Amino acid sequence: MSEARRDSTSSLQRKKPPWLKLDIPSAAPPAAEEPSFLQPLRRQVFLRSVSMPAETAHISSPHCELRRPVLQRQTSITQTIRRGAADWFGVSKESESTQKWQRKSIRHCSQRYGKLKPQVLRELDLPSQDNVSLTSTETPPPLYVGPCQLGMQKIIDPLARGRAFRVADDAAEGLSAPHTPVTPGAASLCSFSSSRSGFHRLPRRRKRESVAKMSFRAAAALMKGRSVRDGTLRRAQRRSFTPASFLEEDTTDFPDELDTSFFAREGILHEELSTYPDEVFESPSEAALKDWEKAPEQADLTGGALDRSELERSHLMLPLERGWRKQKEGAAAPQPKVRLRQEVVSTAGPRRGQRIAVPVRKLFAREKRPYGLGMVGRLTNRTYRKRIDSFVKRQIEDMDDHRPFFTYWLTFVHSLVTVLAVCIYGIAPVGFSQHETVDSVLRNRGVYENVKYVQQENFWIGPSSEALIHLGAKFSPCMRQDPQVHSFIRAAREREKHSACCVRNDRSGCVQTSEEECSSTLAVWVKWPVHPSAPELAGHKRQFGSVCHQDPRVCDEPSSEDPHEWPEDITRWPICTKNSAGNHTNHPHMDCVITGRPCCIGTKGRCEITSREYCDFMRGYFHEEATLCSQVHCMDDVCGLLPFLNPEVPDQFYRLWLSLFLHAGILHCLVSICFQMTVLRDLEKLAGWHRIAIIYLLSGVTGNLASAIFLPYRAEVGPAGSQFGILACLFVELFQSWQILARPWRAFFKLLAVVLFLFTFGLLPWIDNFAHISGFISGLFLSFAFLPYISFGKFDLYRKRCQIIVFQVVFLGLLAGLVVLFYFYPVRCEWCEFLTCIPFTDKFCEKYELDAQLH
């Protein structure tokens, strides 16, 4: 048998022409094949290009069953923490999130800070600043074509999407007709995936549908007159290329891109063939992918040319040829006009859900925020330079927008708290001056007197300052033991220590008062030990007293018994809750009718023993259970919120961030909401909620702390420091994009003018410039530390790492210094009040107690 085979082989060799050379390679084992991580195109039919014939569309797949998995060592906890910290700060070398941030930054600059440099635009191939999109700045990667296709003629693919396929020279001239690329072999570049999605990645698993998405889909189905189930089960039967929601992570439609809806049937035109961001639609499930892989290979369904009349009826346009504009001189000869024959391929596998209707879809459509060119950039007419480095270009293209969750949550909390505060505490008199109320009120002496109550007006249309302090406003006496307030309270207690009960001769009543205030002709001042009713303590008469309606001899709870006898000092006496003898003790200070009890008035801990009518008229806190001012803690009543751990030492330090969620009135809240829905929301889409939340809260806390140091006796509410900290982020964003802006100095002076205007506006009452200044400085440090930005080379990357450490240390030093000044070394600055309020009139700033005079 072997001899016969050798004879046949030799005969064939004799018949072979001398010029013919046969080179038959030996069969190699499957394991020796070069691994390829591309899936077979025949199985994933939804990846087939419209320009590639089915019989030539084959890409080798790896023999996974013949390859052993590569064993890798598990990453240590230290490496994981280091890599995560580097990714979060934006200094990682191979981080996908860092690349996304950097590629998005330039796009943000183009809308916020003005035009870009011409070289930047030429690098990005963006002739227009109007539509700077993610997909328009991408060039799809070359497709691998097998050896059998290398000899095929290249075709023109008019379906390539995006502005990235325009000719660079034409883009510089501002022309708008797209340049049609030439694809390798018969494979279409745009039919597989973009450079961001990557053909080497598998489709992602579907996310769970949210309630809002299902509700909108049901509403859209009802509007179209069909059941929700029918709309859900409906799926596309014919498709010419991959849906964008299958492979692309984040794409955005723009007017200059091709409307791809002509590939589907007319009945499902508005439901199945829209390409919108990934957060609106979902990716196929793993079960669907397995069904696609297990499905038998089907014959390709190739259709003829599309009917032009049908497309016109559907209001669609099929690009059949290149543009008809005038070509640039010296350009290549125009290629012949070829009408493209479209293929339709069947898609297998179930699909969950249904895409929402067009009106609802347009409602949720949002544009990308180019780095440095956000809302403020559009207002100040900023643009990129005409040329940007390719490394910077890749950083911008990989950036994604974030959802402004923190802005929405903050706006909701601000609105809710403001509405509740106005409903519960009411609205104070509106204006810029003082509001005086005069009335005749019964006082502690038993006669009516004309008294005047002076209230600060609030032009923000909101509660009074006392109500704001009770809600949690920034107020230094509630956050620490203020030296002046503490000395004022100690002086009042010293006067009360030498007081006694003044009993009127007509037995109309009695009140605790000093000897000067008690009439010697109409009343008797019962003073121990002069008065015969003085009790004894340790064998001798008490030296201080008496106290109206309180005596250690008749009090049962708490009783004055050895070893728990009441002290000599009456200011240290407890509140007696039960007397044993009632009103018949034969002691004048016990048998009289008391007409005055402690009342806390004002915001500085001032206490008066007066009648309830007078206390209510002065908007004070009346204590029916006490007889002395030393038995009550007025600062605890004034501050409200959680009680002090030590009643003598205020400790509500949490007012530093609690006041960020309060507002002085309705207008104040509306101003904050406008700022948040414009500037804050725009920046959060760039940096994410976690970075913006850190900068917002820490800037506000630092600003309130500085305000509490220099303006300790002024109630301050609102996120003034936080808002200036967010404005500092705009400056940092401008500095980081300085090299790619066409006119950076113009953008800088515009931002500086806005900040100076707001600072000048802070010279009016109720607006704190100390919070503005400190919040801006702290926000500047935090922005340099926490906001990732574009890096212009390896040296710039190392510089940012040093910058993060330096600015974090500087901010911590600033915060520590303010804490030391606030708690350990209080500062009294007389001229500092002129930085936050200029007294244009005598009472313009006096009503806000900037002189810190206690009364």
UniProtKB/Swiss-Prot annotation:
Gene: RHBDF1
Topology of the protein relative to the lipid bilayer: Multi-pass membrane protein
Protein purpose: Regulates ADAM17 protease, a sheddase of the epidermal growth factor (EGF) receptor ligands and TNF, thereby plays a role in sleep, cell survival, proliferation, migration and inflammation. Does not exhibit any protease activity on its own.
Region (Disordered): 1-36
Native source organism of the sequence: Plecturocebus moloch
UniProt xrefs under Pfam families: iRhom1-2_N, Rhomboid
Keyword Transport part of the UniProt annotation: yes
Glycosylated sites: 583
GO cellular component: endoplasmic reticulum membrane; Golgi membrane
Segments of skewed composition (Low complexity): 25-36
Quaternary structure note: Homodimer, or homooligomer. Interacts with TGFA and HBEGF. Interacts with EGF; may retain EGF in the endoplasmic reticulum and regulates its degradation through the endoplasmic reticulum-associated degradation (ERAD). Interacts (via cytoplasmic N-terminus) with FRMD8/iTAP; this interaction leads to mutual protein stabilization. Interacts with ADAM17/TACE.
Family to which this protein belongs: Belongs to the peptidase S54 family.
Domain of life of the source: Eukaryota
Stated name of the protein: Inactive rhomboid protein 1
GO biological process, one term: regulation of epidermal growth factor receptor signaling pathway
Ranges facing Lumenal side: 433-655, 713-714, 768-772, 825-855
Signal peptide start and end residues: none
Positions carrying Phosphothreonine: 180, 183
Primary residence: endoplasmic reticulum
Gene Ontology MF annotations: growth factor binding; serine-type endopeptidase activity
Modification type Phosphoserine: residues: 76, 176, 390
Lineage: Eukaryota, Metazoa, Chordata, Craniata, Vertebrata
Membrane-spanning intervals of the chain: 412-432, 656-676, 692-712, 715-735, 747-767, 773-793, 804-824
InterPro entries hit by this protein: Inactive_Rhomboid, iRhom1_2_N, Peptidase_S54_rhomboid_dom, Rhomboid-like_sf
UniProt keyword annotations, A-Z: Endoplasmic reticulum, Glycoprotein, Golgi apparatus, Growth factor binding, Membrane, Phosphoprotein, Protein transport, Transmembrane, Transmembrane helix, Transport
Ranges facing Cytoplasmic side: 1-411, 677-691, 736-746, 794-803
Localization: Endoplasmic reticulum membrane; Golgi apparatus membrane
